[in-house]
Amino acid sequence: MDDDDFGGFEAAETFDGEQGGNQAVSPAVPWATFPAVSGVRLSPASPELILDHDHSSPSTGHLPPDAVISSADDTHADSSLMSQTISKAQIQQSAHTHLNIPLFPLGLTDEPSHGALALEDEPEGPGVHVSNSQLRQKISSLETKLKASEEEKQRIKKDVESLMEKHSVLEKGFLKEKEQDAVSFQARYRELQEKHKQELEDMRKAGHEALSIIVDEYKALLQSSVKQQLDAIEKQYVSAIEKQAHRCEELLHAQHQRLLDVLDTEKELLREKIQEALTQQSQEQKESLEKCLQEEMQRNKETLESAVKLEKEAMKDVITKAVGEERENLEKVHAEERELWKTEHARDQERVAEAIQAAVQEQQRMSQEAVKAAIVEEQRRSEKAMEEAVKRTRDELVEYVREQRRLDQVTRQRSLSSLELFLSCAQKQLSALIATEPVDIE
């Protein structure tokens, strides 16, 4: 059994095996020596199972293997849909972050003058080493899965950014297309103006009656054409603005609802996983401590009896008397250590429970604040972009309508002045013809 599961006895020295023939000096009484006993060593706590409290790596947070594996399987099962993939990846990352709580092994400490004993019985507990190796393998596999989940989250984040860029490109293309349509309408209007000017020149060459009829038709056609074009352009811009605003509202509503669902799901999963982890950890610690205490008491008793027996046979009468006194002192020290250990154990349990509760509350608060800030920022950006697009489109439309009206007014004035000049010339010619008719008759 690995004595480092519960911290071991720190600041102790190692007793070598009997084959080497070495003897170890007692840390409490330097002049009392003991022969080495097989299976007993003094060593510091093993660093393999001690979790560093200040370590910031994701591998320091240990969850129950079943809970983490089930959450990873759930994440990969729903990866076909974009929204579900995002929510699952966020839930898994948040659960990994919130449960990143280092658990300290419980160690049996003593005063600096005495040290402590760390017992390791490798032949009697092979099952514990197997379970420790399996636990290390599970932890490594869980770390690999968490790294894969982190990569999946980064990939999804890049996809979301690319989608937002595509959305902005499409919006720019839409505005550019509308500008091109406006330019084409202006070109068509100029073509109609040129065509109407040419027709006006042709009408000037025709007779007075045909000219008046054509002028009336031209005026009506010009007014109806300009009015239809203005109405069509105005309807197109209004419909485009309404569609864009409706689309932005739908996107904002869907995003808000999705974030709320993700937050609720994350809270529920974290609550269940934390409760399960605390229950399982408490049960495991209780069972392991009881078993460790029984085995340790038995080993201490056997070790002390064998050590005293060998020491009595090998040492002189004076050393034998000293060993007896040392044995009594050790029993008193063990009793005191046992009382100190019980007090320290209760104190450590209270500290661990308080630390876990404080960490869980802090992580929940930070997660809620981050999600709320992200929601508010995204809403503000979307509303600002929508307002700017609507305002810019409205200003361009108003400017275009004003320009068209001004051009129509100028063209109408020119046409009327030209028509008035033509009519005055025609009237003068008719007057001249009427004046010359009596002379011809005479």
UniProtKB/Swiss-Prot annotation:
One of its GO terms (biological process) is Golgi to lysosome transport. The modification Phosphoserine is found at residues 43, 46. Residues 1-27, 48-80, 114-134 are annotated as: Disordered. Residues 211-414 are annotated as: Homodimerization. Residues 1-16 are annotated as: GGA1-binding motif. Keywords: Coiled coil, Golgi apparatus, Membrane, Phosphoprotein, Protein transport, Transport. The keyword Membrane applies. Its main location: membrane. Residues 130-210, 253-318, 346-408 form a coiled coil. It is found in: Membrane; Golgi apparatus, trans-Golgi network membrane; Golgi apparatus, trans-Golgi network. One of its GO terms (molecular function) is identical protein binding. InterPro entries: CCDC91. GO terms for cellular component: cytosol; membrane; nucleoplasm; trans-Golgi network. It is a peripheral membrane protein. Disulfide bonds: none annotated. Homodimer. Interacts with GGA1, GGA2 and AP1G1. This is Coiled-coil domain-containing protein 91. It comes from Mus musculus (Mouse).
